[in-house]
């Protein structure tokens, strides 16, 4: 936790209706030490860390949640003063499709892949947030998918948004971890979650599986709050019911876990 406190994050308050409390009802997580930080007040966003005995993962080793993109005010200042628990993978550089977005890729203490990103101007076709503190909210969750067109259709139906077209973009960590030239273009697609909040779908590159390997550290789930239940047929009956909330465990194309939280109706 010291690494994230060094970025300026504070601890989040706990409640039985919190996303963390609901996610921790998973029997796999029973009794595991955990801690939750507040990433943003508006939109309200928390990040929960759970102690897990698996190995440190290789980026993009498996399909599913692969990285979080975190908004920062001054990327060069963070680069110059990155807490030592984070390992630099790529220094600040403009994205291949916009000079107004610069990102720095790092690995966190448990190998978690983070894109620290500065937005310096408008990007046509995107509604992007403005940082309110030096290291701020996660505004993009990156999802490695085995069939990008299938996942585009799925998320457009789930979120009730227009289905984007996949576009070629440089994803240097995905290329590097698969022995490709880092200028290689991969198919990616942004999916609008809410204003200033996105999913990025990255076409995954299959790797040989290792039989019997203990699951590594990684992302357990992503919780989102909505005003209504998910579209019919996209989740079974509520998996968890609290005094005020229903929680639906969304059945996704590649098994990436989404907990859909909504009020009782």
PLM regions and their residue ranges:
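Surface-exposed beta-loop interaction hotspot
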Residues: 94-95, 100-154, 161-170
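Short N-terminal edge-element motif at the start of the domain
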Residues: 83-96
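Generic structural signal for well-ordered beta-strand positions
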Residues: 112-114, 199, 256-259
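Core segments of cupin and vicinal oxygen chelate
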Residues: 1-44, 94-97, 143-196
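Short beta->alpha transition motifs characteristic of CBS
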Residues: 117-123, 203, 260-265
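A short, acidic/glycine-rich surface segment
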Residues: 19-24, 54-58, 122-127, 171-176, ...
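Vicinal oxygen chelate
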Residues: 1, 31-82, 102-107, 137-147, ...
């Amino acid at each position: 936790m010291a690494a994230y406190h060094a970025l300026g994050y504070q601890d989040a308050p706990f409640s039985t209706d919190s996303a963390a409390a609901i996610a921790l009802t998973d029997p796999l997580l029973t009794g595991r030490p955990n801690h939750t930080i507040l990433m943003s007040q508006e939109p309200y966003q928390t990040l929960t860390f759970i102690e897990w005995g698996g190995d440190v993962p290789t980026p993009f080793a498996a399909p599913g949640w692969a990285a979080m993109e975190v908004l920062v005010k001054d990327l060069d200042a963070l680069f110059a003063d990155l807490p030592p628990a984070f390992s630099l993978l790529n220094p600040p550089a403009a994205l291949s499709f916009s000079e107004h977005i610069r990102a720095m890729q790092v690995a966190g203490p448990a190998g978690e892949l983070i894109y620290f990103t500065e937005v310096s101007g408008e990007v046509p076709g995107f509604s992007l947030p403005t940082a309110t503190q030096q290291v701020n909210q996660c505004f993009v969750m990156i999802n490695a998918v085995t069939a990008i067109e299938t996942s585009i259709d799925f998320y457009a139906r789930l979120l009730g948004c227009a289905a984007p077209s996949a576009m070629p973009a440089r994803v240097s960590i995905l290329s590097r971890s698969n022995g490709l030239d880092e200028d290689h273009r991969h198919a990616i697609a942004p999916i609008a979650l809410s204003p200033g909040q996105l999913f990025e779908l990255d076409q995954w590159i299959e790797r040989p599986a290792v039989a019997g390997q203990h699951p590594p550290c990684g992302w357990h789930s992503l919780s989102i709050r909505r005003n209504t239940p998910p579209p019919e047929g996209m989740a079974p009956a509520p998996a968890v019911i609290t005094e005020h909330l229903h929680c639906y465990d969304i059945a996704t194309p590649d098994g990436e876990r989404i907990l859909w939280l909504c009020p009782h109706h």
